[in-house]
Every structure is written in structure tokens, then in C-alpha cells.
């Protein structure tokens, strides 16, 4: 009987769903502007002249014009040391009177030395030009993302499932949020709501607010939440823990189905070779986008880093992918664990070379010209891309177009994390009290001063034990919470009320 059944169609519930149309995107009348040949020839002359002044002869020079940058490739004469040319970066920039140039010596796989010079009047790369391109329309990636145009004016498209996670960094106002919007927009143009869900985490509160209209189509959230876009830090921890739970559940289903990846699993499910009664279900990809990750680390620290590292390490096979953006690429935010698991990096302009090294493991991001100019690193090779520009009104039009259509009844529900998992690892069990507990309580009440060092001195015990005693006193309501370096408040004023409390605890 199973042979007669037709293939399962995940899109069946929303078979009437129409993808956003291309006319929702703004067309900028930059057109294919004619290449400014005079500027190009002038720059060629200046480069040759500058190098000649320092005694470096070159055999050939050719220019490739991109939307914001022109790349001049030179071949030096035999016997010229590359390091000599690399050291002349500032001199060449001076003679070209350019904002800042970048020398790539040598160009990987080309046998030339590249000099990147910003154009006098840069072109806008519109999202429309990238999404209407033949390459994007015809690509059959699992999660295709059209980022923008490379230096040769080709559209740059990558598959998020191959990445598998992406780290975005750059100083304020250099185009990070636009980059994230470009990623989300290109996914919305290619993926049906049944095939992809997104978890949007936005500590800035305003960046992703636009996407709340597509909640019932594309977003995933905790079951009892009102808002699908997560802005509250405590909720972020719950959501991330819930995602790790979803990841473990998915791995179990994969194990039962004897497959290795979500792709194989879904193919098997579509062919109706997995029984839904045994808990099998079609799995959509889940893309987690976090804007301003540094803010989360500063407020919640390890609690957030742990689940992120876990998801980053294991979740690629079950179709969960993360895109994390931060404007502070310092080492205490982008830690080693996170770096190891985010092989693909997008670097917008940063201020210092150290920041650039933190993101890309090499300098270069500090020499970009800003406004969507970025380096995309995947493994060892760096690609310079002009990020496609998405305007807020454009995103709004797209989300409204999707939001007006019939969606699912609710947003995709993530598994609930039970209360026991939320208990802090250092939680206090009052049945397992320290033998000195009652004496310490009397001491604190007599002195009316809740300080750990007082307990240490009087009972001559170590800091750790005194700290645990303090936690137990706090749990039983004798002292208040810690307030940095100030002593804790003592809630019980006299020994008589303390004895009553201790009797009730015994």
C-alpha cells in the first residue's frame, strides 16, 4: 500500500503561498555606468611612476573595475622582492590620493600582485540587482544567500548549510545590520515557510522588529511567548537552551531513521519511508540570527556562550545554522570556542588592526572603506565584496507581502525547557547545610553586617566555604543578595526572631 502513496509534500499546508515578487525591491538608476577610463589610466600611470621612483620596474599592469573598488594587478620584473612592494602601501596611497588602498601580495592563484584602490564615485549594489541575477534565480543551494558583488562585478552567492555558521563583525555604522537583512531577505526569496524557520535575537530591540509580521510563516519561538522576536536577555538564554534541546531531539530522530544529515532524513520522509506515528516529522532548517552578540555576552556571559558553542559544534547536521553579529570584535567577546566553530567570517570595516586579526586572523578589515565594503573569509581565502543594500522600506514591503498571505496557526514552537534545567548549577540545597550554619547566622545577626570576610575571620575557614555559608544564609532569608563589594543587607534584626526562624528550618 505504501508504494501507491504519492510523495509527502511539505508545502501542502501552505500550497497557496506565493514567494515575494521581484518588483518589491527598489531599482537604483546606477545602471552599468561607463567605466571611467581616464581615471583608470591616470591611476595606472601613477602606480608605475611611484614604483619606478623606488627602483621597481613592472612588466604589466591591468585593471578590473568593481562597484566600489578597482583592482590593479601588476607583474613585477624578475628579481624584485614582494616585501619591497608591500612596504610601499602608504606611498602608493599618497600618490593616488586615495582613501586607503590594500595591497594583496601575491594574489592567490594568479601570479600577480594586486593593488585595490577605491573608486571616486562608488556604485550602489542594490538587492534587486543581486536577487534578479540569473545565478541566484537558478542556484539550487539548500540555504542560498546572495551577499553582493565581488570585485569582478559577479554576484556572490554562498550556501549557508556549507558554512555552517557565520560570524559578522564590524564597527558601528559600517553595514552589519544591512548585511544581516540581506542574508534574511535572500532566504525569504528562495525558501518556502515549510522548509525554513528563523529565530531572531535582537538585544538592540529595533533591528528585527520589522520581521514580526511574518511570525506565522517563518519565525520560531518558545510556546508561551507573546513576541517572536527575542529582545530580553533572560529569554535569550531560555531560547538558546531550547534550541540545544531541539538539536538533541533531532539527532535522536536521525539516529532512529539511520541517516546522517537532515537532507537525507527529509528525503526519506518525503518518500514516506518514515512513520509519523513514531514521532518522525519533516524538519525545516532553523537559522538563528543574533544581532549585537557583545551585548549578550556582557549581560549574561557564560550562560549564553555555552549553548551557542554547543549548537555551533553539533547542529550543522540537523539543519540548524547561526549567524552572529557583533560590533566589538575583542577577544573576550569572540572567544576561542566561538572562533573555532565559526569558520566563515564576514568582516566590515573595523578601526584597528587588532580587531581585524580577531575576526579574520589577519589584517585587512581595517583598510576597508566602509558603507558595506567587506571581506568574506571562508577557510584561508579572502574575498572582497560590496554588500547589497537593503532599505528598511524594502524589507517592510517584503514582510507585508508575506504577512498578508495565509500562514500557519502559530509560529514554529521550540521545545520547552523544563524548570530543572534552569536551576543555577550553584543552587543551594538547605537540607545539606554547613555544620557552622547556625553559628554563622547568630554572628551575622549580632554584628548586623553580612560580610563573607567576617565569617572567614571568626571561624577561620577558607573563602569558598564562607561563600557557601553566605549562599545558604541568603537562601534561608537571613541576608540579602550580594551587591558587588558592599556588605549584604541583614533582614533579621534580633536574636529572638532568628531562633524562631532556625527552629522552623530544623
Which sequence ranges carry the predicted segments?
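Low-complexity, intrinsically disordered P/S/T-rich segments
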Residues: 1-165, 216, 356
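Short, intrinsically disordered, mixed-charge
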Residues: 49-53, 87-101, 185, 189, ...
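Glycine/charge-rich, flexible interdomain linkers and switch-proximal surface loops
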Residues: 62-72, 101-119, 257-273, 280-283, ...
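Charged, low-hydrophobicity low-complexity segments
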Residues: 1-60, 265-266, 276-278, 397-435, ...
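P-loop NTPase catalytic phosphate-binding loop
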Residues: 16-20, 107-112, 116, 134-260, ...
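Conserved alpha/beta core segments of nucleic-acid transaction machinery
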Residues: 378-474, 478-506
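A generic structural signal for well-ordered alpha-helical segments
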Residues: 51, 93-96, 315, 339, ...
Amino acid at each position: 500500500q505504501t508504494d501507491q502513496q504519492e510523495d509527502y509534500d511539505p508545502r501542502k499546508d501552505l500550497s497557496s503561498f506565493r514567494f515575494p515578487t521581484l518588483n518589491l525591491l527598489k531599482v537604483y538608476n546606477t545602471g552599468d555606468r561607463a567605466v571611467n577610463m581616464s581615471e583608470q589610466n591616470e591611476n595606472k600611470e601613477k602606480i608605475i611612476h611611484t614604483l619606478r621612483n623606488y627602483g621597481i620596474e613592472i612588466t604589466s599592469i591591468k585593471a578590473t573595475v568593481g562597484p566600489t573598488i578597482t583592482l590593479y594587478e601588476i607583474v613585477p620584473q624578475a628579481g624584485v622582492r614582494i616585501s619591497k612592494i608591500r612596504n610601499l602601501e602608504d606611498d602608493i596611497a599618497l600618490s593616488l590620493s586615495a582613501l586607503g588602498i590594500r595591497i594583496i601580495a601575491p594574489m592567490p592563484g594568479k601570479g600577480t600582485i594586486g593593488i585595490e584602490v577605491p573608486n571616486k564615485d562608488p556604485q550602489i549594489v542594490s538587492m534587486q540587482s543581486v536577487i534578479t541575477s540569473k545565478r541566484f534565480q537558478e542556484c539550487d543551494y539548500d540555504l542560498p544567500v546572495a551577499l553582493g558583488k565581488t570585485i569582478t562585478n559577479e554576484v556572490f552567492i554562498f550556501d549557508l548549510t556549507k558554512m555552517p555558521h557565520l560570524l559578522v563583525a564590524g564597527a558601528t555604522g559600517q553595514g552589519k545590520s544591512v548585511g544581516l537583512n540581506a542574508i534574511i531577505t535572500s532566504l525569504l526569496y528562495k525558501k518556502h515557510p515549510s522548509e525554513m524557520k528563523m529565530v531572531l535575537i535582537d538585544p538592540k530591540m529595533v533591528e528585527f522588529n520589522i520581521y514580526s509580521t511574518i511570525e506565522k510563516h517563518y519565525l520560531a519561538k518558545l510556546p508561551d511567548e507573546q513576541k517572536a522576536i527575542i529582545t530580553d536577555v533572560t529569554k535569550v538564554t531560555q531560547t538558546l537552551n531550547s534550541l540545544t534541546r531541539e538539536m538533541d531531539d533531532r539527532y535522536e530522530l536521525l539516529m532512529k531513521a539511520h541517516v546522517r544529515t537532515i537532507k537525507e532524513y527529509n528525503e526519506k520522509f518525503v518518500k514516506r519511508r518514515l512513520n509519523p506515528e513514531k514521532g518522525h516529522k519533516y524538519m525545516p532548517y532553523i537559522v538563528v540570527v543574533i544581532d549585537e552578540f557583545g551585548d549578550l555576552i556582557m549581560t549574561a556571559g557564560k550562560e549564553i556562550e555555552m549553548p551557542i558553542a554547543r549548537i555551533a559544534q553539533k547542529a550543522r547536521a540537523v539543519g540548524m545554522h547561526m549567524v552572529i553579529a557583533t560590533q566589538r570584535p575583542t577577544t573576550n567577546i569572540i572567544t576561542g570556542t566561538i572562533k573555532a566553530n565559526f569558520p566563515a567570517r564576514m568582516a566590515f570595516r573595523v578601526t584597528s588592526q587588532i580587531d581585524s586579526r580577531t575576526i579574520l586572523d589577519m589584517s585587512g578589515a581595517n583598510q576597508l572603506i566602509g558603507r558595506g565594503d567587506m571581506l568574506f573569509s571562508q577557510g584561508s581565502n579572502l574575498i572582497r565584496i560590496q554588500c547589497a543594500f537593503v532599505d528598511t522600506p524594502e524589507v517592510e514591503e517584503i514582510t507585508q507581502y508575506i504577512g498578508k498571505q495565509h500562514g500557519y496557526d502559530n509560529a514554529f514552537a521550540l521545545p520547552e525547557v523544563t524548570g530543572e534545567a534552569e536551576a543555577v548549577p550553584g543552587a543551594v540545597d538547605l537540607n545539606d547545610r554547613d555544620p557552622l550554619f547556625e553559628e554563622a547566622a547568630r554572628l551575622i545577626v549580632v554584628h548586623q553586617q553580612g560580610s563573607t570576610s567576617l565569617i572567614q575571620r571568626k571561624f577561620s575557614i577558607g573563602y569558598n566555604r564562607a561563600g557557601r555559608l553566605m549562599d545558604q544564609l541568603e537562601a534561608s532569608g537571613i541576608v540579602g543578595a550580594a551587591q558587588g563589594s558592599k556588605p549584604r543587607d541583614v533582614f533579621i534584626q534580633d536574636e529572638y526572631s532568628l531562633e524562631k526562624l532556625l527552629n522552623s528550618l530544623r
